[in-house]
């Protein structure tokens, strides 16, 4: 008969053995994905290309385009946005129309629509990895696999690069949201400053709410109605000559304080209303954004502004949940080329400084090359700029030839001339270096 001491020792040993087995257990095997089906290609896809469509095991729709003369390179694309509401199967068609240059260069293209609408970065990263596996399992085995994230899709791509480090051999980020949640702080600043100046979102006769939630879940406000309110207060829908002096003054205050052009006011106000509402809904009804302690500058009476502007406190748990879903640590195991327009008013170029700092702090600074374009465009800078970026990243991956901003600029011009196009189509600025994000977005 065993003594209690021996029984306890045996139980402890058994528990340790079970824990050891669980510790050594393999990660769950992903579900088997159905093969995609051949479908007609969207308009604009190069002649001879083959298009495949399907819906993955998590219900995300996707599109795969295989060029007639395949380079052996697969580019998995993470699209921008995010688009609020249910995902549209046509989203991938829109993406390939914009990024058909990828296929024209001979590379296969695969893009997921993402199964969740709105701000769901981790699940979008999972969908991105899933479409890569579908390509490998059912279409072809690429010699190289690159991950391309555009705009908000760069947030998805950085997440996917850290979640699935063995899936990618290089990462290209264009116009990317690469500074994490801090990228969006100024959208709450926009809401607070707008309400201070206009007091019509919400109106005094409407139920009040914390602006940090974007919009109450039961609100019926539409984008058109919001635009009408902004036009009443700021004259954003009118030529400058038709604005009242008071409208012009308010609009100038927003531009001076928040440091973006008047043409971007509505997009940022929309984000701070509808997209922020989606963020809050996905974070349990509380907001990860706040402006307590922010010191606003840029007016003739900054003290008066800071005393009067509405203030809101971020919920700590929402902050943690939001960061866990959308943020990266700069721990990328492969070469990263990140490119941004200097005057991008949608996603500020200063976020690139945060990317550099994070990768350096993580010990991966040597895996980053950044290039900058003399443009104010966010979505697409013109065909001249992208072939050289794919070429530079592939040369780095395959030959160990790390590109330089100057080399990218020079090679862009060479490729343009070789194609019989004017070299002036290239707008890279080799010696540009972005300032810290805190010089553009008020720190908190």
Model-based region annotation:
Residues 338-340:
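Short beta-strand/loop motif that positions the catalytic acidic residue
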Residues 69-70, 131-151, 167:
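Gly/Ser-rich "nucleophile elbow"/oxyanion-hole loop immediately N-terminal to the catalytic nucleophile
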């Amino acid at each position: 008969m065993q003594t209690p001491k021996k029984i306890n020792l045996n139980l402890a040993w058994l528990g340790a053995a079970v824990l050891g087995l669980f510790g050594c257990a393999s990660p769950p095997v992903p579900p088997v994905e159905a093969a995609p089906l051949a479908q007609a290609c969207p308009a604009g896809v190069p002649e001879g290309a083959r298009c495949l469509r399907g819906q993955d095991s998590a219900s995300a729709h996707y599109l795969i385009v295989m060029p007639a003369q395949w380079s052996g390179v697969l580019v998995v694309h993470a699209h921008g946005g995010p688009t609020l509401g249910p995902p549209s199967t046509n989203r991938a068609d829109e993406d390939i129309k914009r990024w058909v240059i990828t296929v024209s260069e001979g590379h296969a293209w695969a893009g997921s629509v993402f199964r969740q609408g709105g701000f769901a970065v981790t699940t979008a990263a999972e969908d991105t990895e899933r479409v890569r596996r579908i390509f490998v399992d059912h279409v072809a085995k690429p010699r190289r696999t690159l991950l391309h994230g555009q705009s908000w899709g760069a947030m998805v791509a950085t997440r996917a690069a850290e979640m699935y480090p063995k899936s990618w051999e290089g990462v290209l980020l264009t116009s990317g949201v690469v500074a994490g949640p801090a990228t969006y702080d100024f959208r709450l600043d926009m809401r607070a400053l707008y309400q201070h100046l206009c007091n019509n979102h919400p109106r005094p006769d409407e139920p009040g709410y914390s602006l940090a939630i974007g919009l109450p879940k039961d609100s019926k406000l539409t984008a058109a109605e919001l635009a009408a309110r902004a036009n009443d207060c700021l004259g954003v829908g009118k030529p400058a000559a038709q604005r009242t002096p008071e409208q012009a003054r308010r609009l100038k205050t927003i531009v001076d304080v928040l440091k973006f052009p008047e043409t971007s006011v509505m997009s940022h106000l929309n984000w701070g209303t509808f997209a922020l509402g989606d963020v809050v809904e996905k974070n349990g009804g509380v907001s990860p954004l706040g402006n307590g302690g922010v010191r606003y500058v840029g007016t003739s009476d900054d003290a008066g502004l800071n005393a009067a502007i509405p203030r809101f406190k971020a919920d700590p748990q929402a902050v943690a949940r939001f960061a866990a879903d959308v943020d990266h640590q700069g721990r990328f195991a492969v070469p990263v080329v990140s490119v941004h327009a200097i005057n991008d008013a949608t996603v500020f170029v200063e976020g690139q400084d945060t990317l550099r700092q994070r990768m350096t702090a993580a010990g991966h600074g040597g895996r980053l090359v950044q290039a900058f374009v003399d443009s104010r465009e966010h979505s697409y800078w013109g065909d001249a700029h992208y072939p050289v970026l794919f070429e530079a990243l592939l040369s780095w991956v395959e030959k160990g030839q790390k590109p330089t901003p100057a080399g990218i600029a020079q090679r862009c011009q060479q490729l343009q001339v070789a194609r019989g196009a004017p070299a002036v189509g290239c707008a890279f600025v080799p010696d540009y270096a972005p300032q810290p994000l805190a010089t553009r977005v008020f720190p908190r």
